[in-house]
């Protein structure tokens, strides 16, 4: 038998030199690195279970930051290279900073992720009784397929501000002994009329009512006995009355925990991975950032799922104001610092799904296990509502990733004219900063249970880390 290795043909050599040859990360990475990815995602799963809302994500980020030596930001203070600090915006967004050796005039390296996710928010007057069942009226937040959110165990998170100004934290449905809540649905035997509705109306917004109780208060002198009984329970537990719902922010989210998916445990399934998969990886990158050349920031922001409007979203001015305050101490203009800066908009993309392949253009779609995905633009139709990263900046990011052996890919959000979406990249770009979306491909995005690859998640962490180290 001839044991000589077959020599490559001229065509094979030329193809190897000239043509793209993307490979699954599971084939590119060593077993040791795959084990590192798996271990990294254990911490990620814990984060998903702890930080199910934007407020909880900020609380967890602060706890981890302080453990890593970060201090609260002091406006007007002159910071030295290596100093680490954080700024919290209204309890719903956070900026974490590590000062670099170069001056701020050389710009900032920024990773920007969002920590809000689709959910069901309680209305301001949510509590009612109907046919001796007690329910909460909800108003869905973000873009959802409403039918996916019925018959799912839900927990309730948020804050209630009482009439005297006291703030009460609510978190019920997460502990194993807690009750859960649920949006009901009609049985198939009686669903003839429902099944004739168009898919977007299969479940209507006003039908997303959360079932919260059924036992009456034992007093024939009162009406709405079940409602009264539920309110009595809430009063005993939290000290609130019905009018306190007016000044409350309560969010119903899926109650199940993050879990490994697949016989090979290669994926993570959980609520809220858009965009907490990028929030966690960007957070870990800044926490482990030491003595960077350039000043580095991770921003975890709110309101992306509803357009980034509001004073905790990146369509507001809190980020440029923060940079301006920081720059002023060094005699610099904030706008000049921003213009010299670079950002990875840390947001997810849709992973190619072979079961639902029609909306995807396979040559330009991201895939599970092919690494972190760089998305040059998002938007819709003729690239409306997006930042389109320049070839020069894409080339800069490409070179950075390749030099550091990051497993990465490119992807668009589906076919042209097939729909669309947006990220915070457009608002960062509007500040006059170079930016490109870099994130993790997600299956079943915006569903109560989303799926990501452990390899892709780990590569996102490595991608943000090399930006900070550059």
Regions found by a protein language model. Give the residues of each.
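N-terminal hydrophobic/helix-forming segments and targeting peptides
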Residues: 1-470
């Amino acid at each position: 038998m001839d044991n000589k290795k077959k020599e490559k043909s001229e065509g094979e050599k030329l193809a190897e030199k000239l043509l793209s040859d993307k490979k699954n990360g599971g084939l590119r990475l060593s077993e040791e690195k795959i084990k590192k990815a798996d271990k990294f995602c254990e911490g990620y799963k814990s984060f998903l279970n702890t930080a199910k809302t934007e407020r909880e994500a900020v609380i967890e980020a602060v706890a981890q930051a302080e453990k890593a030596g970060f201090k609260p930001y002091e406006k007007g203070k002159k910071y030295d290279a290596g100093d680490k600090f954080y700024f919290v915006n209204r309890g719903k967004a956070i900026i974490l900073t590590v000062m670099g050796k170069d001056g701020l005039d050389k710009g900032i390296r920024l990773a920007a992720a969002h920590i809000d996710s689709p959910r069901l928010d309680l209305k301001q007057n949510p509590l009612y009784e109907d046919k001796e069942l007690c329910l909460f009226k909800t108003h869905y937040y973000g873009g959802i397929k409403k039918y996916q959110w019925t018959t799912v165990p839900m927990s309730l998170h948020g804050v209630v501000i009482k009439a005297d100004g006291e703030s009460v934290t609510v978190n019920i449905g997460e502990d194993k002994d807690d009750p859960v809540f649920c949006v009901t649905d009609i049985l198939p035997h009686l669903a003839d009329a429902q099944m004739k509705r168009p898919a977007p109306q299969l479940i209507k917004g006003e039908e997303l009512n959360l079932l919260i109780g059924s036992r009456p208060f034992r007093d024939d002198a009162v009406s709405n006995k079940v409602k009264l009984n539920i309110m009595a329970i809430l009063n005993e537990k939290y000290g609130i009355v019905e009018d306190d719902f007016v000044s409350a922010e309560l969010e119903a989210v899926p109650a199940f925990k993050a879990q490994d998916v697949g016989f090979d445990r290669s994926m993570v399934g959980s609520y809220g991975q858009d965009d907490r998969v990028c929030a966690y990886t960007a957070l870990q990158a800044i926490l482990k950032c030491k003595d960077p050349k350039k000043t580095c920031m991770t921003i975890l922001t709110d309101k992306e799922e509803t357009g980034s409007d509001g004073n905790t979203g990146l369509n507001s001015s809190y980020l440029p104001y923060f940079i301006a305050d920081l720059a002023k101490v060094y005699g610099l203009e904030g706008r000049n610092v921003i213009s010299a800066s670079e950002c990875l908009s840390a947001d997810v993309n849709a992973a190619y799904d072979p079961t639902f392949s029609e909306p995807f253009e396979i040559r330009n779609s991201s895939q599970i296990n092919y690494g972190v995905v760089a998305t040059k633009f998002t938007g819709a139709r003729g690239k409306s509502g997006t930042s389109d990263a320049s070839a020069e900046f894409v080339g800069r990011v490409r070179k950075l990733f390749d030099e550091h052996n990051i497993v990465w890919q490119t992807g668009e959000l589906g076919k042209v004219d097939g729909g669309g979406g947006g990220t915070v990249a457009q608002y960062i770009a509007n500040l006059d900063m170079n930016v490109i979306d870099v994130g993790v491909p997600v299956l079943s995005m915006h569903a109560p249970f989303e799926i990501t690859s452990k390899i892709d998640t780990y590569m996102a962490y490595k991608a943000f880390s090399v930006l900070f180290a550059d």
